[in-house]
Structure formats: structure tokens, C-alpha cells
């Protein structure tokens, strides 16, 4: 057999082409990395010498360049170092050797290194643009973070611009504020890190303890304090300490003897403390991200209102007309105590989730105020003139609070002895969340459809075999008998109430379109069921199938659709309603649209509807359409009807 024949027949298997050599196990078993790793710190095949802290280290250009853009530019990018046999680098020696071992082997045992070496490694990974290594070291530092090293890790993160690691360190310090103030590592903080820490509202500890720790920091860093410009920095740091949060006794006995605090600073603090409302002072508070702090487990309790035990028990299923809620009598008195929840301590929150009693179609109006001392209150939610129901998702700017006051101003149904209107709240949660939706004038400006059962929207007027047919999102399964909501022309309407007021600028609807009929209608919105604003007038248009309506952004909690014409019979049929409109063009700012689509252009948009819309194209003349659908034989159990008869055709 010839040598050529032997070569051509290597690895001739059904899974490989003739001449292919598959030695994958050579790479998987680590043989290649072992061979490359053996070249680390070896002069064998070396073509460059790196000088670090005076020590010469043999290296290989191609391996360095393949591992990092920094070395690729340095050794092959036309810089003078590309033609030098020796290249000097500014780096700590031990950390650089560990970096080389990583470059040549892909392995690094961080747990075997000293903490200062690990931080040096982080700096080298940043300097030489080893992004994966930088991320891996950052993850490792998160895992081993402790009081002894958090300050040095924070300084390193600030130095290298590692925002995620820096935030993690600050959050760790927030959670351990009292302990870190007494730890020796606090004295090692850089000026910038110290100022950043003191500026945080979430660095929660008694202000007098913070002041004492800052004094200790000054004493431990006297060389810096006495340096040029040091005194100016001292004043900046002292301004980060919130003297107004201390008692007068603490100001006079603890702060006053400290030399850097001038008499003017002390007097200004006393004046601000005595003349400023507590709600206007900058407080510190406990921050527990994404955790409900209004629970008995966290020390919260209801201190005002009737049937207090229900509000914070977490049970949002078992409630009826007799139990499962906390209540208070609604009155016009400006000092109405309402329902008050006291948190265990001052806490930072920006989100309240509230469940209003919703076993019928009643609506409530209310407002929410917060306080740190139960004396000065600030209103964070004002729905006192808006109809609201069921679950309320309420967002506001982060605030430090200890008291939450819920005051009802209206209940559309309930009265006690026909005299007193009562406000009922089933559940309340309070937390700080990073998942804040877009807001406009304090109201949610939704991106996704909020007219859904899941978000507590409800059809309060209109006839349907299924109570939630209009809001269930089903735009495919409807026919002559089911899948729509309707009302008699000239009598009644279709009315949808959202759970709470939203800032809306568009609505999309699907008119019943199983034949070639067309409709006319108009749409109004309201906040209280008495005052209505028209947002669409299509009473003179022949409309069918999908309808997209744009209007100037406004608060909306109730939507009313009134049909004025049906080309086939005397009933207006609606299959689906959503707001805002879930089409790309509807998400564009209406103010930026040079020309809105006309009603005729919106008659039918197959791309926005179901796959069967193509068969529902422009209708032929009415005379060519099919006959009216048969009338249903019987009316289903009472739903949300407003008429005595059913209108399904």
C-alpha cells in the first residue's frame, strides 16, 4: 500500500470525510492547554521579555496578543514596543505573574491568593482589558465580601469604574451600617467612597453614630486632613453628615466640642431643625429591595382603623361582606384618621400595592399620605376624585417613611344604617422596587394592555354570554352566538372600568366582523362616571373590524362605547377592547404624529388582527351580505347586563 493511500484513508468513518482528522479528545482532555501552560514563564520559544518591577519575564507575543486587545495593540499594532525585545510594564509583580498563568492556562485559583493580590488582579484585568476575567473576579469578590474587605473592594470598584460591583458594596454597607461604623476597615475608606456612602439615604444608622465614625476617620487620616486642600474636603464631608437628624442634646454635647464644626454650622443645623417640617428634612431609612415591609413579621402594625388585623395578614382570597378587611368611616373632616400603618422603623419605599374590597362592582376613591413622625404628612397618591376598584399598583418617588395613612373619600355602594359611607381595604403592601413603569403626573403610563381581568378591569355595562368576553384577549374564537359584548342601539352602552386611573392616549377595539356589516359609534372616557370626554366620534363613518383610536394623553379610569348604527340590525357588537393599543404605531407619541390615520384607514388592518382577517376584507354592498344571524333561544344567567333582553344579533 502506497504512503499516499495510507494518508488519504486516515479516519475514514461514516461521520467524517476522507482525509479529516478528528482528535477532539486531545483538546477536551486538556492536552493542548497543558502544552501551552508549560510555556508560561519559560524562555522556550520566547520572543519578548516583559520587565515588571525590575524582573525579566520571558513571554510569547502571539499568546499575549490572542488573549487581549491591549497586548495585540501593544505588540502588533505599530507601537514602538512591537519592535522591542524588552517591554517594561507598570504592574505589581505577583499579580502579573498570576495573570500570565491565567493567559497561558485559562485557570486561576482566586481563593489561593491574598486579598490584596486579588484586588491587584482586578486592576490588571481592567488595565489590560481582560473583560471576562474582570467579571469573574468581580463575582468572586461579591461572594467573599465581608466587613474586613468591603471598604477596599469599594475603593477598587470606584477606581476602575465597576458600577455593578460598587453598587453591591454600597448595598452591603447599607445592610451592615451599624457594624461598619465600628469596624477598623471604615477608617481605610477613600475620601470619595466616604462621601458617596454618607450621601446615601439608605445608609441607615443613628446620625450621632455616623458623626462619631466620621470623627474617627478624620483622626486616622491626619496627614490627609493637614494636607493642602484637606480642610476644604473636611467641610464637604461634614456637610454629608445630617446634623438636623440629631437631637439638640446630641448637637450640644457631641457635635459642638468637635473642632472642625464651626459655630455657624451648628447654629444653621439647629435653625433648620426647629423651623423645617420633618417631611422636608432629608432622612435616612432602611432599604430592603423588593421586600414587603408592611408585614407583622417585619414589625408593621395597623394603629388606626376598624378590624385592624386583616389588612396586613397577607390573605387576599378569604374575604366577604363580614370579614377579611380593615375599614374606616368616610367623612369630609380634614383630620380624618383613616387607616394608619406603622412600620417598624423609618424605611425607604416607592411602591404601595393595595387591594380594595371587590366582591361587587363598587368603586372607591382615596388618597395616601406618609410621615416619619405622624405629625407632618405628605400626600404621595391622590385618587380622591377618581373611581378605583380591586388591586391598586401605586408608584411614587422613593421616600423615607414610617407611617402610611390611607383615607377613603368615596364608596359608590356601601352605607351603614343609610348614614355613614365606609371605606374597605383588604390588603396593603409597601416596598421599594426597581421595576417602576413609566409615570406621567403620578399616573402609570402603560405600555401593555391594562384592560384585562388580570389587572382587575371589569365590564360594568353591556350584555354578553360570558362576563369577561370583551377583556379576555380572545380575538379568534367568536361567532354568531358568543365571544362579544353588545348593547341595543339608542339604549345603554358598553362600559369598561379599569382598576385605577392610567395615563392613556390610545384604544384599540375589534368590532364583530363575521359578515360584511359595518357600524358607527363614539367613545368617551371618564374618571368618575359623571364627567365624560369624547375621544372618538365615528358616528358618520362606516366602520368594521379593527379600530385604533388616538387621542391627547389624559387620565382614564372608565371607557364608554356607544354604538349609533349597525348596517344589518339594531344592536352594536364589540369583540375586544384594549388600552393602550397594542400595535407599534400606537406606541408613538401622538403629538409627534404629523397625520393620524383616518377612520376609513382604520376600518380593517389584517396585520393587527387574527389570521382570519384576510377573509374579512372590504365588504360588498349590503344587499349581497348574508342574512341576519338567528336569535339565541335563551338568556344565560345574569351577567353584567343592563337590558332585559339579550341582543346577540
Where are these regions (language model features)?
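Cytochrome P450 catalytic domain signature, combining two hallmark sequence patches
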Residues: 69-84, 106
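Eukaryotic intrinsically disordered and solvent-exposed regulatory patches
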Residues: 33-37, 44-46, 86, 107-108, ...
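Post-BTB helical module
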Residues: 104-188, 195
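BTB/POZ-protein C-terminal extensions
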Residues: 159-162, 168-318
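Disordered, acidic Ser/Thr/Pro-rich linker "stalks" and the adjacent N-terminal cap
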Residues: 248, 252-346, 357-360, 427-500, ...
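Trp- and acidic/polar-enriched beta-sheet ligand-binding modules for extracellular glycan
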Residues: 335-337, 356-435, 487-492, 511-649
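Conserved, well-structured core segments
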Residues: 48, 58-65, 87-91, 120-126, ...
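N-terminal BTB/POZ boundary and linker segment
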Residues: 1-65, 94, 98-115
Amino acid at each position: 500500500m502506497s504512503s499516499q493511500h495510507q494518508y488519504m484513508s486516515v479516519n475514514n468513518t461514516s461521520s467524517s470525510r476522507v482525509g479529516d482528522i478528528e482528535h477532539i479528545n486531545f483538546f477536551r482532555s486538556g492536552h493542548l492547554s497543558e502544552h501551552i501552560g508549560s510555556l508560561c514563564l519559560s524562555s522556550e520559544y520566547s520572543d519578548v521579555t516583559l520587565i515588571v518591577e525590575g524582573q525579566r519575564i520571558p513571554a510569547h507575543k502571539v499568546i499575549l496578543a490572542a488573549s487581549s486587545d491591549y497586548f495585540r495593540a501593544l505588540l502588533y499594532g505599530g507601537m514602538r514596543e512591537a519592535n522591542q525585545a524588552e517591554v517594561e510594564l507598570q504592574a505589581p509583580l505577583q499579580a502579573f505573574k498570576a495573570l500570565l498563568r491565567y493567559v497561558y492556562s485559562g485557570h486561576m485559583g482566586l481563593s489561593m491568593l491574598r486579598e490584596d493580590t486579588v484586588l491587584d488582579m482586578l486592576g490588571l484585568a481592567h488595565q489590560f482589558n481582560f473583560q471576562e476575567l474582570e467579571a469573574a473576579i468581580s463575582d468572586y469578590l461579591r461572594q467573599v465580601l465581608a466587613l474586613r474587605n468591603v471598604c477596599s473592594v469599594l475603593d477598587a470598584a470606584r477606581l476602575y469604574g465597576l458600577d455593578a460591583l460598587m453598587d453591591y458594596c454600597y448595598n452591603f454597607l447599607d445592610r451592615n451600617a451599624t457594624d461598619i461604623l465600628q469596624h477598623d476597615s471604615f477608617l481605610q475608606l477613600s475620601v470619595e467612597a466616604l462621601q458617596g456612602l454618607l450621601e446615601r439615604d439608605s445608609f441607615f444608622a443613628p446620625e450621632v453614630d455616623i458623626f462619631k465614625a466620621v470623627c474617627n476617620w478624620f483622626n486616622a487620616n491626619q496627614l490627609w486632613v493637614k494636607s493642602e486642600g484637606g480642610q476644604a474636603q473636611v467641610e464637604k464631608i461634614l456637610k454629608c453628615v445630617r446634623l438636623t437628624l440629631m437631637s439638640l442634646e446630641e448637637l450640644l454635647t457631641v457635635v459642638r466640642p468637635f473642632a472642625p464644626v464651626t459655630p455657624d454650622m451648628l447654629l444653621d443645623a439647629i435653625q433648620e431643625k426647629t423651623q423645617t417640617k420633618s417631611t422636608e428634612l432629608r432622612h435616612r431609612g432602611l432599604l430592603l429591595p423588593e421586600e414587603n415591609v408592611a408585614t407583622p413579621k417585619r414589625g408593621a402594625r395597623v394603629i388606626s382603623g376598624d378590624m385592624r388585623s386583616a389588612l396586613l395578614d397577607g390573605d387576599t382570597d378569604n374575604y366577604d361582606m363580614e370579614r377579611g378587611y380593615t375599614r374606616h368611616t368616610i367623612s369630609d373632616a380634614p383630620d380624618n384618621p383613616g387607616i394608619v400603618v406603622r412600620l417598624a422603623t423609618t424605611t425607604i419605599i416607592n411602591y404601595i400595592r393595595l387591594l380594595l374590597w371587590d366582591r361587587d362592582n363598587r368603586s372607591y376613591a382615596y388618597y395616601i399620605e406618609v410621615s416619619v413622625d405622624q405629625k407632618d404628612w405628605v400626600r404621595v397618591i391622590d385618587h380622591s376624585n377618581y373611581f378605583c376598584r380591586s388591586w391598586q399598583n401605586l408608584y411614587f418617588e422613593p421616600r423615607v417613611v414610617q407611617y402610611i395613612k390611607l383615607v377613603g373619600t368615596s364608596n359608590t355602594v356601601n352605607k351603614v344604617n343609610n348614614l355613614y359611607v365606609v371605606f374597605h381595604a383588604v390588603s396593603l403592601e409597601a416596598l421599594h422596587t426597581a421595576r417602576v413603569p413609566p409615570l406621567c403626573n403620578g399616573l402609570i403610563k402603560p405600555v401593555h394592555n391594562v384592560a384585562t381581568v388580570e389587572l382587575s378591569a371589569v365590564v360594568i355595562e353591556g350584555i354578553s354570554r360570558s362576563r369577561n368576553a370583551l377583556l379576555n384577549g380572545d380575538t379568534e374564537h367568536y361567532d354568531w352566538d358568543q365571544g362579544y359584548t353588545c348593547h341595543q342601539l339608542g339604549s345603554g352602552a358598553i362600559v369598561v372600568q379599569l382598576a385605577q386611573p392610567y395615563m392613556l392616549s390610545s384604544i384599540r377595539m375589534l368590532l364583530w366582523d363575521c359578515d360584511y356589516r359595518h357600524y358607527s359609534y363614539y367613545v368617551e372616557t371618564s374618571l368618575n362616571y359623571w364627567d365624560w370626554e369624547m375621544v372618538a366620534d365615528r358616528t358618520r363613518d362606516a366602520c368594521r373590524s379593527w379600530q385604533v383610536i388616538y387621542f391627547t394623553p389624559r387620565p382614564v379610569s372608565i371607557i364608554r362605547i356607544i354604538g349609533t348604527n349597525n348596517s344589518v340590525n339594531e344592536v352594536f357588537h364589540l369583540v375586544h377592547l384594549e388600552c393602550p393599543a397594542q400595535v407599534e404605531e400606537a406606541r408613538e407619541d401622538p403629538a409627534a404624529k404629523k397625520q393620524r390615520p383616518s377612520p376609513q384607514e382604520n376600518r380593517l388592518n389584517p396585520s393587527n388582527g387574527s389570521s382570519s382577517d384576510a377573509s374579512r376584507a372590504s365588504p360588498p354592498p349590503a344587499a349581497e351580505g348574508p342574512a341576519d344571524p338567528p336569535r339565541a333561544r335563551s338568556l344565560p344567567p345574569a351577567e353584567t347586563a343592563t337590558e332585559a333582553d339579550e341582543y346577540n344579533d
